[in-house]
């Protein structure tokens, strides 16, 4: 058996130099180590990485309590993976950034830790991490191709050595190798002795013995089998050659290493496996969010307990910009879809008074008998009435007499238009306070007694507290904005600011609740414009999946906020923004061509939760009853969105969650499992793949919209007591599992 690579932990120094066949990369786990080559000594401290290349002479000198680990790749294995592997030369330089060194160290620490643990997934995980390590070295560690990086001065001798390293287990002869390089046997023998100081046969036997040592150390195979698979004609020939080179018989060599097996580390010294794993964990944590690791396990046990906690669903307020946008059939369809999927029932529109003032002050005489300046407005009102939507209108710059007069004309007309139908739920929203609002609200309430007044609450509003108190009897809600991006100076890229920004929404919510309490203001809150960290550019769209972050914010806000606002779609949103920074203030539900953004599905999944909370922790909530419940699991990792632009560093962090729901009633249950993550339901990844310089045709649009949807799995399961689920969680993903017991027959 020939091993492709070795994974070792060493606590003892080497007494002599060795020449490496293959490639070695490692780091100092603890203490200090001196790494010697032919000409230099490199002092390595804890965490420092070292690389030893093919044919290099090397020796380790460990200081007191020093521990190193390394991965040694056999040349035959490398040759199968890379062209000209024997010429590949890696060297750590200043070009190897700290971030990339952390990544290398992290992969190695995971690899060694996995090897020590030796569970049923270890071999598969080792192979994955080994490939990941090599890929990372190829991408991030500077390399050159040196045809003569070894001590050999003759390229043809070098070729022979490489050939022997790759084919040592075959029947090789001086005649065959001389023909391989185009020399006579005598000339090759002479050059070999001049370059290496040993003859051809001695070099061949030494190479075979070094590989046989690995089999003696790491396998339980019979000595005869080891002899034959390493190129010897018989066990007797192998034994003679082995004793000549090592001064031991193969049996004696194996007997001196009774504690070492293929699945254990050779040099444990005074350190047990658990101690080594704890030491390695310090390095694994450094880049934990950016490394894919199928052995990242999380075991969660849930037993339902009686609780008085309740989960509150939100009233969703959808911004459409100008009221006339409600005449667009595509926008109407989007609103109705939202209404169906998560009970959207309120629309926020911009102020129509400037339009009415312009019509009333037109240079020609308005004739009510032949024209209607409210025609389009009436059509919009009819749509809202037909589908039970309420209308909230933003009043802006309302302090002039002309504005107040136009407002009264508008309100009077709306009251007349809806009087013959069911009542329209009508609200007014103001972002600034002025005394003229008192006159306007009195007129409004006379015609719409059930109408509401929304006041934007911030520090400017607080400075007008006396007027706010006068209006308080008419106020239904206080409205506020909270954009995490406002807490960050993107030009500085300060990670501390990004950490603070991750809590910005909930912190501002708590600040306003405290402000209301101090001034004895008791009204529910609406979070209208809000966003998590995105970066101040459209480039990050789709690169940083945020579903889990958004669901985390919704759960934190559910007991503090009554309403949540969204823009209906990208086109409406961006058309009302002055710049990219302004665009970051809010989130839209639809992209172009009716494509649903992940935030849409986040709202949809959140709406599937019921009010009774059975269990909750930092990453999970269960609602419902013990026979009909919903499990929401999510991952929320807040990090600088610009890191998502580095494709190599933005690897998926995959966690396998083993979830047990205990003490359930025996019976047959139906399971519906929704998965929303970067691979399931993320619009922009598919969008970019199917978008051309000329846009998207209908087939592409239909396909992208059809495929951009959370994954759904449905199945039945017969349970006696415990529901066991295995859930693959990708960074910032969301899983909603609906569990319903069938009635007993």
Swiss-Prot record:
Disulfide bonds: none annotated. The keyword Repeat applies. Residues 175-196, 223-246 bind DNA. Pfam families: HTH_18 (PF12833). One of its GO terms (molecular function) is DNA-binding transcription factor activity. Gene3D superfamilies: Glycosidases, Glycosyl hydrolase domain, family 39, Homeodomain-like. The keyword Transcription applies. Keywords: DNA-binding, Repeat, Transcription, Transcription regulation. It comes from the Bacteria. Residues 158-256 form the HTH araC/xylS-type domain. This is Uncharacterized HTH-type transcriptional regulator.
């Amino acid at each position: 058996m020939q091993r492709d690579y070795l994974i070792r932990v060493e606590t003892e120094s080497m007494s002599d130099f060795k020449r490496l066949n293959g490639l070695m990369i490692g780091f100092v786990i603890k203490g200090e180590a001196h790494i010697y080559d032919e000409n230099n000594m490199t002092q390595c401290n804890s965490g420092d990485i070292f690389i030893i290349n093919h044919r290099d002479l090397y020796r380790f000198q460990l200081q007191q309590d020093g521990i190193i680990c390394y991965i040694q790749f056999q040349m035959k294995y490398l040759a199968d993976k890379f062209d000209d592997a024997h010429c590949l030369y890696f060297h750590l330089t200043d070009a190897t950034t700290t971030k990339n060194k952390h990544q290398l160290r992290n992969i190695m620490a995971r690899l060694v830790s996995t090897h020590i643990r030796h569970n049923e997934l270890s071999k598969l995980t080792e192979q994955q991490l080994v490939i990941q390590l090599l890929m990372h070295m190829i991408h991030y560690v500077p390399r050159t191709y040196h045809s003569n990086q070894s001590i050999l001065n003759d390229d043809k001798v070098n070729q022979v050595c490489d050939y022997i390293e790759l084919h040592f287990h075959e029947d090789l002869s001086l005649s065959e190798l001389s023909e391989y390089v185009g020399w006579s046997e005598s000339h090759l023998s002479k050059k070999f002795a001049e370059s290496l100081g040993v003859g051809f046969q001695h070099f061949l036997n030494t190479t075979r013995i070094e590989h046989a040592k690995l089999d003696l150390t790491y396998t339980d195979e019979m000595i005869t089998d080891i002899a034959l698979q390493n190129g010897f004609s018989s066990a007797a020939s192998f034994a003679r050659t082995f004793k000549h080179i090592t001064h031991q018989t193969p049996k004696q060599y194996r007997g001196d290493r009774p504690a070492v097996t293929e699945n254990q580390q050779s040099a444990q010294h005074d350190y047990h496996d658990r101690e080594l794993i704890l030491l390695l964990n310090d390095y694994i944590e450094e880049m934990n969010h950016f490394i894919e690791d199928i052995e990242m396990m999380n075991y969660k046990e849930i037993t339902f307990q009686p609780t008085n906690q309740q989960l509150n669903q939100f009233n969703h307020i959808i911004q459409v910009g100008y009221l006339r946008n409600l005449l667009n059939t595509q926008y109407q369809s989007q609103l109705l879809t939202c209404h169906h999927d998560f009970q959207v029932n309120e629309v926020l529109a911009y102020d129509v008074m400037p339009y009415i003032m312009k019509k009333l002050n037109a240079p020609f005489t308005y004739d009510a008998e032949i024209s209607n300046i409210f025609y389009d407005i009436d059509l919009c009102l009819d749509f809202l009435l037909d589908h039970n939507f309420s209308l909230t209108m933003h009043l802006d710059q309302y302090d002039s007499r002309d504005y107040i007069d136009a407002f009264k004309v508008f309100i009077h007309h709306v009251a007349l238009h809806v009087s013959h139908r069911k009542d329209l739920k009508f609200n007014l929203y103001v972002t600034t306070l002025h005394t003229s609002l008192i006159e306007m609200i009195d007129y409004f309430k006379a015609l719409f007694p059930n109408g509401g007044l929304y006041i934007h609450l911030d520090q400017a509003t607080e400075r007008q507290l006396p007027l706010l108190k006068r209006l308080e009897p008419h106020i239904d809600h206080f409205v506020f904005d909270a954009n995490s991006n406002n807490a960050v100076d993107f030009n500085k890229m300060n990670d501390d600011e990004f950490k603070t920004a991750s809590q910005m929404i909930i912190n501002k919510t708590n600040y306003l609740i405290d402000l209301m309490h101090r001034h004895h203001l008791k009204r529910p809150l609406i979070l209208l414009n809000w966003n998590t960290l995105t970066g101040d550019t459209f480039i990050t769209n789709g690169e940083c999946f945020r579903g889990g972050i958004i669901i985390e914010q919704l759960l934190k806000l559910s007991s503090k906020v009554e309403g949540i606002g969204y823009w209906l779609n990208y086109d409406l949103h961006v058309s009302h923004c002055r710049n990219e920074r302004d665009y970051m203030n809010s989130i839209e539900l639809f992209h172009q061509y009716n494509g649903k953004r992940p935030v849409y599905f986040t709202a949809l999944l959140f709406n599937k939760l019921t009010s009774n909370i059975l269990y909750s922790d930092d990453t999970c909530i269960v609602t419902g009853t013990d026979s009909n419940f919903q499990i929401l699991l999510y991952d929320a990792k807040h990090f600088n969105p610009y890191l998502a632009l580095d494709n190599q560093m933005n690897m998926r962090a995959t966690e396998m969650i083993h979830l047990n729901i205990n003490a359930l009633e025996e019976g047959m249950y139906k399971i519906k499992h929704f998965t929303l993550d970067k691979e399931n339901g993320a619009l922009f990844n598919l969008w970019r793949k199917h978008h051309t310089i000329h846009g998207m045709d209908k087939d592409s649009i239909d396909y992208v919209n059809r495929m951009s949807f959370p994954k759904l799995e449905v199945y039945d399961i017969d349970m006696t007591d415990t529901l066991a689920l295995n859930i693959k969680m990708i960074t910032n993903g969301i899983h909603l599992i609906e569990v319903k017991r069938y009635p007993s027959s």
